[in-house]
């Protein structure tokens, strides 16, 4: 059983860029997406999919569903695969029971926590590509709603809601790809 501390995790990362902020949309709910469905593929059920996204003025709240075949925690081979694409993951600031960075827990942490950090890294990369300076932090939080059923919630702050949704979609695709390769 997970302790309260391992059920909840927070992350913050400062991007290297700060573009103009998109207008706030208020609360918007988007339907679930799974990368394979978007491509029109009839592939097996993805390991990770987003069931629901609510976009708020300052953050988006994402309900994430893991398939029954999906591990609930990360493992070294998965981390190695993700580090090839996201080498800065271990340096992310992260409140956790073992240290102050994501690197302290990344080899054995809830998979939704991994998804949170990959999405943040995608947002940081997007911000960095736009400009060269920023004082904006991206903050995330993840927690299980029902770990037995594989249902979790990831919350992410953003500067641009569309870029944040794109980052989440990319993160889901990359985590699914990495899980498939392990």
Protein language model regions, located:
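Intrinsically disordered, low-complexity interaction/regulatory regions of eukaryotic proteins
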Residues: 23, 27, 33-37, 103-111, ...
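M16/MPP (pitrilysin/insulinase) zinc-metallopeptidase core fold and M16-derived inactive scaffolds
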Residues: 85-157, 161-163
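Intrinsic structural disorder
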Residues: 1-2, 58, 75, 104, ...
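Intrinsic structural disorder/low-complexity segments
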Residues: 11, 116-120, 176-179
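M16/insulysin-pitrilysin zinc metalloprotease superfamily fold
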Residues: 155-182
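Generic alpha-helical propensity signal that fires on short helical segments
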Residues: 78-82, 130-132, 170-176
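Non-catalytic terminal extensions that flank enzyme cores
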Residues: 2-96
């Amino acid at each position: 059983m997970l302790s309260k501390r391992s059920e909840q995790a927070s992350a913050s990362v400062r991007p290297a860029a700060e573009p103009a902020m998109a207008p706030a949309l208020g609360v918007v709910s988007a339907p679930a997406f799974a990368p394979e469905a978007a491509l029109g593929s009839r592939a097996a059920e993805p390991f990770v999919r987003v069931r629901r996204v609510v976009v708020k003025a300052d953050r988006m709240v994402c309900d994430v569903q893991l398939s029954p075949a999906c591990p609930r925690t990360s493992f070294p081979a998965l981390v190695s695969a993700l580090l090839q694409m996201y080498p800065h993951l271990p340096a992310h600031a992260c409140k956790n029971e073992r240290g102050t960075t994501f690197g302290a827990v990344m080899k054995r942490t809830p998979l939704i926590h991994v998804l949170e950090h990959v999405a943040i890294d995608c947002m940081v990369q997007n911000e960095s590509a736009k400009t060269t300076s920023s004082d904006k932090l991206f903050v995330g939080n993840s927690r299980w709603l029902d770990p037995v059923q594989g249902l979790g919630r990831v919350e992410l702050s953003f500067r641009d809601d569309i870029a944040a949704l794109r980052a989440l979609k990319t993160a889901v695709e990359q985590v699914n790809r990495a899980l498939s390769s392990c």
